[in-house]
Structure formats: C-alpha cells, structure tokens
C-alpha cells in the first residue's frame, strides 16, 4: 500500500509490502462517500514512530472518496483525524466504550492525495482479541464509541445504530494469535465496564438508575419535611 510512504515511515511502508500484510480492498458506501478498507498489518518493530520496538501494533489503511467523483480538497473535506469521520476498532463481546482507538492507545494519521482522503489507523495489537470478531468502524463526526452509536446483540455482535452514518468492516485476524488472558487484563486495566449489554439490558439498567434517583429525591424531600416539622 504505497500511501504509507506519505507518512515518512519507511519501516511501515515496508511492512505493508511484506507477506505479513493483508490486502483487502473491501468497499462500502457511506452517505455521499465510498469507503475502502485497503489493508492491514500487525507486528512489532514495523514503524519508526513506535517508541517501544518490542510492542506489537496493528495498522490499517482506509481511503474515502466521493462516490460522484468530485475530488476531495481541503476546501470541501475536513481530513483531520476525527473531522469528517472517526475511525476505530471494536471487538464483539466487549463494551464499545472499553475497546476502541482511544483506550487502545491508538492514533489516526490522515491526509489528502489525488482527490482522496486516506486514514492510517495505529493501535495496540488487535491480535489478542482474534478469538472474537474484530471490526474496523468508520462513522460521521467526532465522538468516542458508545451505546448511543453502537448496539450489541445477545451473541456480542456489534452494529451501528440506524441513525448513525457510517460502516463497519470485519478484520481478518488469525485466531491462533488470540491471547484471552492479555485481552482480559487489558479491558480490566481500562477501568471501564467492559461486559457487553444489549438494548434490553440497557433499558433495565436505566430504569433501575431512574428508580434510585427517585428514591434519593424522595429521601431528601422527607428529610426537609421532618426538619420543617421540628421547627
């Protein structure tokens, strides 16, 4: 994937030319745009910008172009990361707030070239989650992944909500690279609830929280009444 040369990272460019790279070129339509997941690669010491050469990272390249052929320029497209779109990995069976580009110490480089926008996603290695379905999601605007944008089915499958403009790709990771212990340690280290919740479970939780708020408000009201009586 030659666009990685734009990042001034010869090591990463070489990694994308190696046998370890997976070239995908999968395409989806998002509003007025055509989005292509070009490819991905995982490994240690494959980018000169990674301070720890022993740390394994995952990189993925996504391109965006207007479906009608109009070239993207700085005047008609916000190419900065999390400008027009947010790009993030997600993992089935995990709360989207716990496993995403932000919690995975990730970053996304972006630039315009020949009328297209390119995004290069860089995160901690996703291979530890490969015994689950691992997604790459792209959605409009800037916001951290949440249940407002994503829903989870009973089997842990993650999907965009109907009112969210975006798309999701499945990353073809080798299941033999999975490390459930490392995955568990990671999600617990975030301090964020990581067990998935369906819409039905979220509704029950919300109802319980509303009830607790009502009880708390009633308690304050009763205390005020007793104070007034005492006076």
What role is predicted for each listed range?
Residues 2-231:
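Alpha-helical, hydrophobic structural elements that either
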């Amino acid at each position: 994937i030659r666009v990685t040369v734009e990042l001034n990272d010869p090591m990463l460019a070489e990694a994308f030319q190696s046998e370890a790279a997976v070239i995908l070129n999968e395409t989806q339509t998002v509003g007025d745009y055509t989005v292509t997941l070009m490819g991905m690669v995982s490994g240690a010491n494959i980018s000169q910008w990674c301070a720890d050469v022993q740390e394994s990272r995952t990189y993925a390249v996504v391109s965006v172009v207007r479906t009608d052929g109009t070239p993207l320029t700085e005047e008609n497209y916000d190419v900065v990361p999390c400008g027009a779109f947010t790009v993030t990995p997600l993992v089935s069976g995990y709360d989207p707030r716990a496993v995403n580009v932000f919690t995975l110490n990730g970053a996304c480089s972006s630039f315009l070239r020949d009328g297209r926008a390119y995004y290069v996603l860089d995160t901690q290695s996703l291979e530890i989650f490969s015994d689950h379905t691992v997604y790459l999601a792209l959605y409009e605007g800037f916001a951290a992944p949440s249940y407002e944008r994503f829903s989870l089915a009973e089997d842990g499958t993650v999907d965009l909500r109907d009112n969210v403009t975006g798309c999701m790709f499945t990353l073809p990771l080798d299941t033999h690279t999975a490390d459930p212990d490392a995955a568990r340690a990671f999600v617990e280290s975030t301090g964020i609830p990581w067990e998935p919740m369906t819409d039905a479970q979220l509704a029950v939780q919300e109802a319980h929280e509303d009830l607790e708020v009502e009880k708390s408000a009633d308690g304050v009201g009763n205390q005020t009444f007793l104070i007034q009586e005492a006076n």
